[in-house]
Amino acid sequence: MVLVGAYAGLRWGEAAGLTRAGIDVLRSRITITSTAVEVRGHVTLGNEPKTSRSKRTVPVARSVMRRLEEHLANFVGPESDALVFTAPRGGPLARSLFSRRVWQPAVIRAGIPHITFHGLRHSFVAILVAAGCNVREVSEWAGHNSVAFTLTRYGGLFEDGSDAAVDRLDALLGDGSKDPDNVLQLHTRNLR
């Protein structure tokens, strides 16, 4: 479950409600069409995702998909609606149970203070940016309601492109270091 949070950017409810039908092993994709919602310890399935853009298909690294494929083979029923992640005795996984019995003890053992499951989404976005994905792709795959939100929240992770622009301009115009007398003539029209 941690892998789909960190490497596919799924929200808790999306991961808890993920079914076998949402996993395309051959294309290495996860499709989100519904979520699980917990109210006072009771989990309901088949709920609408957070926003209309939350319904999405996310590319997943093949190394992560191989681990997910092993999980499917060993722990998930063959039915298309079989939940990928379940409670210890089967059935939907409650966030409160997972947090108390699995997540918090693991975080403490790892020595990572105050990280939440949702924090894994932030890691996912950072990984996409580091991999060179553009803001539109990041926004779409994270299920954000707009590119503007992605830029507001994560804009500092994206390179602004200025260094690349300088390199392209130097390639076009020259950097002036070889012959200072070699000046590109700019012609203008008389605007009178």
Segments the model singles out, each with a brief description of its role:
Residues G5-A36, R136:
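Short, charged phosphate-coordinating catalytic segments
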Residues A8, V58, R66, E70-S96, ...:
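Short, basic (Lys/Arg/His-rich) helix/loop patches that form interaction surfaces
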Residues L18-A21, R101, S123, T152:
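Structural detector for helix-capping/boundary residues
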Residues G22-R29, H114, C133-G155:
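Short, polar N-cap/turn motifs at the start of nucleic acid-interacting alpha helices
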Residues R27, A36-V64, G77, P88-G91, ...:
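C-terminal secondary-structure termini that scaffold catalytic or DNA-interacting sites
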